Amino acid sequence: MKKTTVINSEISSVIAGMGHMDWLGIGDAGMPVPLGTKKIDLALTKNLPSFIDVLKNVLTELEVQKIYLADEIKTKNPEQLQAIKQLMPNVEIEFVPHSELKKDLAKTHAFIRTGEMTAFSNIILESGVVF
Protein backbone atom coordinates (compact mmCIF):
# COMPACT_ATOMS: atom_id res chain seq x y z
CA MET A 1 0.00 0.00 0.00
CA LYS A 2 1.16 3.53 -0.79
CA LYS A 3 2.86 5.27 2.15
CA THR A 4 2.60 8.90 1.09
CA THR A 5 -0.35 11.18 1.73
CA VAL A 6 -1.93 11.25 -1.75
CA ILE A 7 -3.82 7.96 -1.84
CA ASN A 8 -6.30 8.89 -4.58
CA SER A 9 -5.04 6.77 -7.47
CA GLU A 10 -6.04 9.22 -10.20
CA ILE A 11 -4.39 12.22 -8.52
CA SER A 12 -1.29 10.19 -7.70
CA SER A 13 -1.01 9.01 -11.30
CA VAL A 14 -1.37 12.53 -12.72
CA ILE A 15 1.30 13.92 -10.37
CA ALA A 16 3.65 11.04 -11.15
CA GLY A 17 3.31 11.77 -14.86
CA MET A 18 4.02 15.49 -14.62
CA GLY A 19 7.27 17.05 -15.72
CA HIS A 20 8.83 20.46 -15.24
CA MET A 21 6.41 23.31 -16.03
CA ASP A 22 3.38 21.04 -16.50
CA TRP A 23 0.08 22.29 -15.10
CA LEU A 24 -2.49 20.84 -12.70
CA GLY A 25 -5.75 22.59 -11.81
CA ILE A 26 -7.70 22.43 -8.57
CA GLY A 27 -10.96 24.23 -8.05
CA ASP A 28 -14.38 24.77 -6.66
CA ALA A 29 -17.47 22.79 -7.53
CA GLY A 30 -18.70 25.35 -10.05
CA MET A 31 -15.61 25.67 -12.23
CA PRO A 32 -16.38 24.63 -15.82
CA VAL A 33 -13.92 22.09 -17.16
CA PRO A 34 -13.08 22.26 -20.88
CA LEU A 35 -13.96 19.24 -22.99
CA GLY A 36 -10.93 17.02 -23.31
CA THR A 37 -9.46 18.01 -19.93
CA LYS A 38 -9.29 15.12 -17.48
CA LYS A 39 -11.59 15.85 -14.53
CA ILE A 40 -10.97 14.16 -11.21
CA ASP A 41 -14.21 14.78 -9.34
CA LEU A 42 -13.80 14.58 -5.57
CA ALA A 43 -16.92 16.59 -4.69
CA LEU A 44 -19.16 14.71 -2.26
CA THR A 45 -21.41 17.49 -1.01
CA LYS A 46 -21.21 21.22 -0.34
CA ASN A 47 -17.71 22.09 0.90
CA LEU A 48 -16.57 18.48 1.15
CA PRO A 49 -13.75 18.16 0.47
CA SER A 50 -12.67 21.76 0.73
CA PHE A 51 -10.43 23.42 -1.81
CA ILE A 52 -7.71 24.11 0.74
CA ASP A 53 -7.67 20.52 2.06
CA VAL A 54 -7.22 19.15 -1.45
CA LEU A 55 -4.52 21.73 -2.21
CA LYS A 56 -2.65 20.82 1.00
CA ASN A 57 -2.79 17.15 0.05
CA VAL A 58 -1.52 17.71 -3.50
CA LEU A 59 1.32 19.90 -2.24
CA THR A 60 2.69 16.98 -0.23
CA GLU A 61 3.70 15.33 -3.51
CA LEU A 62 3.91 18.03 -6.17
CA GLU A 63 6.83 20.45 -6.38
CA VAL A 64 5.31 23.79 -7.39
CA GLN A 65 7.30 26.69 -8.81
CA LYS A 66 4.47 29.01 -9.82
CA ILE A 67 0.72 29.36 -9.37
CA TYR A 68 -1.99 31.04 -11.40
CA LEU A 69 -5.00 32.61 -9.72
CA ALA A 70 -7.92 34.72 -10.90
CA ASP A 71 -7.52 38.47 -10.33
CA GLU A 72 -10.97 38.42 -8.78
CA ILE A 73 -9.81 36.37 -5.78
CA LYS A 74 -8.13 39.51 -4.39
CA THR A 75 -11.46 41.24 -3.76
CA LYS A 76 -14.05 38.45 -3.92
CA ASN A 77 -12.29 35.83 -1.75
CA PRO A 78 -9.33 37.39 0.11
CA GLU A 79 -9.52 34.77 2.87
CA GLN A 80 -8.84 31.99 0.38
CA LEU A 81 -6.00 34.02 -1.13
CA GLN A 82 -4.40 34.35 2.31
CA ALA A 83 -4.75 30.61 2.93
CA ILE A 84 -3.05 29.88 -0.41
CA LYS A 85 -0.21 32.29 0.34
CA GLN A 86 0.31 30.68 3.75
CA LEU A 87 0.68 27.26 2.14
CA MET A 88 3.12 28.50 -0.50
CA PRO A 89 4.84 31.62 0.83
CA ASN A 90 7.79 31.42 -1.56
CA VAL A 91 5.95 30.48 -4.74
CA GLU A 92 5.49 33.03 -7.51
CA ILE A 93 1.87 34.05 -8.13
CA GLU A 94 0.54 35.25 -11.46
CA PHE A 95 -2.92 36.79 -11.42
CA VAL A 96 -5.01 36.50 -14.59
CA PRO A 97 -8.65 37.30 -15.39
CA HIS A 98 -10.99 34.50 -14.32
CA SER A 99 -12.09 34.05 -17.93
CA GLU A 100 -8.47 33.35 -18.91
CA LEU A 101 -7.96 30.94 -16.01
CA LYS A 102 -10.99 28.96 -17.22
CA LYS A 103 -9.56 28.75 -20.74
CA ASP A 104 -6.13 27.76 -19.40
CA LEU A 105 -7.62 24.64 -17.82
CA ALA A 106 -7.48 23.14 -21.31
CA LYS A 107 -3.67 23.14 -20.94
CA THR A 108 -3.63 21.24 -17.65
CA HIS A 109 -2.89 17.55 -17.20
CA ALA A 110 -6.05 17.36 -15.10
CA PHE A 111 -8.51 19.40 -13.08
CA ILE A 112 -9.41 18.28 -9.57
CA ARG A 113 -12.96 19.32 -8.67
CA THR A 114 -13.57 19.81 -4.96
CA GLY A 115 -16.79 20.42 -3.06
CA GLU A 116 -15.73 24.02 -2.37
CA MET A 117 -18.57 26.53 -2.53
CA THR A 118 -16.73 29.84 -2.31
CA ALA A 119 -16.13 32.02 -5.34
CA PHE A 120 -12.82 32.01 -7.20
CA SER A 121 -11.37 29.06 -5.27
CA ASN A 122 -9.47 27.90 -8.33
CA ILE A 123 -5.77 27.50 -8.99
CA ILE A 124 -3.39 26.24 -11.62
CA LEU A 125 -0.19 24.76 -10.23
CA GLU A 126 2.94 24.80 -12.37
CA SER A 127 5.28 21.97 -11.48
CA GLY A 128 8.87 22.60 -10.58
CA VAL A 129 11.82 20.27 -10.26
CA VAL A 130 13.19 18.66 -7.12
CA PHE A 131 16.84 18.89 -8.11
UniProtKB/Swiss-Prot annotation:
It is an enzyme of class 5 (isomerase). Keywords: Carbohydrate metabolism, Cytoplasm, Isomerase. Pathway: Carbohydrate metabolism; D-ribose degradation; D-ribose 5-phosphate from beta-D-ribopyranose: step 1/2. Its main location: cytoplasm. It comes from Oenococcus oeni (strain ATCC BAA-331 / PSU-1). Catalyzes the interconversion of beta-pyran and beta-furan forms of D-ribose. HAMAP family: D_rib_pyranase. Its EC number is 5.4.99.62. Belongs to the RbsD / FucU family. RbsD subfamily. One of its GO terms (cellular component) is cytosol. SUPFAM superfamilies: RbsD-like. GO terms for biological process: D-ribose catabolic process. This is D-ribose pyranase. GO terms for molecular function: D-ribose pyranase activity; intramolecular lyase activity; monosaccharide binding. Substrate binds at D28, H98, F120, S121, N122. InterPro entries: D-ribose_pyranase (IPR023064), RbsD-like_sf (IPR023750), RbsD_FucU (IPR007721). The gene is rbsD. It is found in: Cytoplasm.
